[in-house]
């Protein structure tokens, strides 16, 4: 597969009128193929692999929040990056997951061709599946280069998405507590 991706980048350079054998571009197809494999490595990962057994029994039933998880993904429409932060919360019901595993779940889904709306939902559903918690909340704010570098070229635009499951959806007080806590410095 790697050779095919590299050949495709070589062809793109040629179709742009470039010489892929010139000094500055000689290794570009291989580097671009390697970068694309890294940026989409989420396709090679699954939830069990990412968790690596880090699900623990716990009596805690209070909100757990992991804030400011940096993320980057590729827009599935233009293959251009979107870059932002995710805030993920859940209400445990007998189980908690390792702190780094929340960030790894975000990365697993972000490192695929995506739209932000689906990414937000996929993260929420995965955390719900793993924790079996009473609720999950995910809020993502991101800047999309497909909107900044092309099309309408709006440099300061940002997109926000949220998914609320369980108590976060059904209980406005719980939802508002989450939204307030993610804005607190």
Swiss-Prot record:
User: What is the top-level taxon of the source organism?
Assistant: Bacteria
Among the GO biological process terms of this entry, one is: tetrahydrofolate biosynthetic process
**InterPro entries from the entry?**
GTP-CH-I_C/QueF (IPR043133), GTP-CH-I_N (IPR043134), GTP_CycHdrlase_I (IPR001474), GTP_CycHdrlase_I_CS (IPR018234), GTP_CycHdrlase_I_dom (IPR020602)
Question: Which PROSITE patterns is this protein grouped with?
Answer: GTP_CYCLOHYDROL_1_1, GTP_CYCLOHYDROL_1_2
The EC number(s) this enzyme carries: 3.5.4.16
Q: Name one Pfam family in it.
A: GTP_cyclohydroI
Q: Which GO terms describe its molecular function?
A: GTP binding; GTP cyclohydrolase I activity; zinc ion binding
Q: Does the keyword GTP-binding apply?
A: yes
* Gene3D superfamilies named among the record's database cross-references: 1.10.286.10, 3.30.1130.10
For the ligand (Zn(2+)), the binding residues are 75, 78, 146
User: What is the protein's given name?
Assistant: GTP cyclohydrolase 1
| UniProt source species | Alkalilimnicola ehrlichii (strain ATCC BAA-1101 / DSM 17681 / MLHE-1)
Gene for this chain: folE
